[in-house]
Amino acid sequence: MSKKRVYELARELGIDNKELISRLEKLGIAVKSHSGTLEDSEVDRVTKEFHARGSREMVEQRIKTTVIRRRAVRVPEKEAVLEKVPVEMEKEMGKALPEEVPEKIAPSRETPPAKVVKPRPVVPEKKIPAAGEKPLAPPEKPAEPVAPPIAEILKQEKIQPPEKFAEEPLKKPAVIEPEKAAAAPKAVPGEAKPLPRTERVQEQGKPVPGRKEGRTPVSRRPAETRFPAKPAPQPEMARKQVVAAAPGRAVPQEKGAPKTEAEKPRKKIKLPDETRKGEQIPARKKTVLKKGPEKTDFRGTLEEEIIERAVRPPRWKEEKKAAPVKMKKTEITVPKAIKRRIRVGEAITVGDLAKKMGVKAGEVINKLMRMGLMATINQSIDFDAASLIATEFEYQVEPAGMEYDESMFKVESSVENLKPRAPVVTIMGHVDHGKTSLLDAIRKTRVTEGEAGGITQAIGAYRVNLKGREIVFLDTPGHEAFTAMRARGAQVTDIVVLVVAADDGVMDQTVEAINHSKIAGVPIIVAINKIDKPEADPGRIKQALTEYELVPEEWGGDTIFSEVSAKQKIGIEELLELILLQADVLELKADPDRPARGVVIEARLDRGRGPVATVLIQEGTLHEGDAFVSKTEYGRVRAMNDDQGRRIKEAGPATPVEVIGFSRVPQASAEFNAVEDEKKARSIGDYWMRKEREKELSATSKITLEQLYEKMKEGVKELNVILRADVQGSLEALSDALTKLSTDDIKLKVIHGSTGAITETDVMLASASNAIIIGFNVRPDARVAEIAEAEGVDIKLYDIIYNVIADVRAAMEGLLEPEYREVVLGRAEVRDLFRVPKVGTVAGSFVIDGKVTRKANVKLVRDGVVVFDGKIGSLKRFKDDVKEVLSGFECGIGIEGFNDLRMGDMIEAYINEKVERKL
């Protein structure tokens, strides 16, 4: 049994492989692909089912698309008429067409007319019969037909129909309306397979059925031209006619075949009675062909029609030539004015800005470069730069609205809820003037004895009870490195106690503390300390402070002065009374019922408890379990301790408290606010974190072309440092102090700084960035020390800030290139010249002062002008080579590479001495 592949059967049926596979699956025939094989029984089953359902599906599909429907309308009528016309002609003329003609006509390869059923041109090798009909025997010669030449077709002069056809009384079918043309197939028996292309016959001026109004139909041929000059293809009409009359061919449809849905007429069309009889069809076809002279679109006689089809191009090619598709240029859509506004925060990346404006990032970068600003697609630019760039693209930039602001935490308290609170007093002054000792005397403690170097290096908050009243003291460092701490203390305090040593006088940090207090608008009480010393002179101190507008009350001013001795406990009670008196004048009050608000005084990372911060509550009451936010950090109060280390449940206004529960170590001087829940706290913290990140990106990426060139030209060296400190305030002080050591030749860069112990991450970062690690009041564990030694990372540990600054300064000086200084050794006068073969000119010289050495450099000076700078080639005394010649002796001096010596020249001997540079 022969087998047939799926694609072969699909080609015979004129449908796609996918469609045939789908039909096979519906019939229960399993195939894997288009190259699968089918048995003969399966082939018969598929073909029967195809012809039983194919026409119905084709009609349903043709109704959906008008162009396809027009093709289907003319197929049955054309084929039926072409089948009958040769038979009538054979009877009249007594001569049948040659049998060889259909064998020589090539089938037309044209676009299939439908999607559901795609008919294929008549293939001579095999004809698929209709459903319920036995297949006829194939022709003896199944070879591929070849189209005959046009000249051979023209020789058949009697192929034109006789005039008798025009005399038959068929008037209605003479002019076929477009609507009636669709119903014409009813008179023709059902056919197994429609031909692929049909000719549209219509009157000029009438629209094609189904075509949209307003579209001009493409003309096939000008009305006045019988034979178009266009080249063309296969003679389709001739093929249809001769194939229909050729003997031995399979007839497309027998009388007994069932009618398909394609042959059913539309309801609004009434066909003439003549169409019910098959014998009337030839006369109708003949009438259609003979009506040509009355219609402007008629093709002429059959012979002319054959010639025209032979030389005319296909309709689809004609349409392409007649109506070429014009490619439209891409139109740039311009948004409306209301949409040409973008919202930008404090910083935005170049890519995000380009996306908001709907332009390419490269165009934005090009604009930035023209402005002299170097930036990549991922770098950030500030709001001003973004505004300038957006203006270039005709966009308006609006600042993005703040989601959160400090003002949202400000709550107006009613006067009834305000209650008196304790004053906050900050002790300020120069280093080693006795600030902490004075506070120890007040608190009756010994804090000074436990401080490294006897100096305060962190801000502290304490609460003192005096005669039933409380005073909160803030102790600030006096060292020059702790300027930020002193400024922070002045901003949160009510009263400043300025401590000045009676034996030392007004110093730099004393003046700085005065300025901080004036900026904060805080009243100042001057405490003259160390009056117990013999060299103490309080009057001199008062006189010096008048230069800074601090005039004692006894001198007619408004500044309170108090003389104390912290070591001898002299004048402590009087000082406290003056503080309370000043507090009464200020009438300090706060609302304890509102949500807590305060400021972070100090923060550190505790190994066992995590981030810990000293917070001074200014308003409201903070309870254990409250959610809070401090700028970028947030959390929930897990525990609170007072200044004595005791656990407390709540803290009211003017209370220093140690808070545990931060997400990270907060920034010193940051605001502290209690919120409704932790979710809101997290949202606010994340928002401020994004804002800080935008600022950092904007600051790091903002570099102009000029700055880039200068930086490359300078070749500045950098010393990278990683800082670790016990508390946040000390970390800030260290960072500021070290950064100030930078010069034009060497820069110190703090690449990372945090609180807590030195970790492995710090060591790996230092190794990658070639940095040193400085630990202040912290130490690494054994494991970290081993890793640092293996990586070659230098870890420096300190507990006094003086030593940190001194060592870092020395390290920076070691990176500086040394300077070279000329040191003149002596001078010699040329008094005679000697010409020595193979050596050159030797100057007979007399050493005037100093000495001339063999390895020294020399300068030849003539008339006060340096003529040559080089080295001594030879130094002789008489005939002996010597290392040096002292003043008052004669010698012979030869200079390397120079012989133009003259009498009276001066020879200066010198050396370049290396001098280490200092910062």
From Swiss-Prot:
Q: State the Gene Ontology terms under molecular function.
A: GTP binding; GTPase activity; translation initiation factor activity
Q: Where in the cell is it found?
A: Cytoplasm
Chain positions recorded as GTP binding sites? 429-436, 475-479, 529-532
Q: Ranges for the tr-type G domain?
A: 420-589
One Pfam family cited in the UniProt record for this chain: IF2_N
Q: Where is this region: G3?
A: 475-478
Nucleotide-binding as a keyword of this entry, yes or no, is yes
Region feature (G5): 565-567
Q: What is this protein called?
A: Translation initiation factor IF-2
Taxon lineage: Bacteria, Pseudomonadati, Thermodesulfobacteriota, Syntrophia, Syntrophales
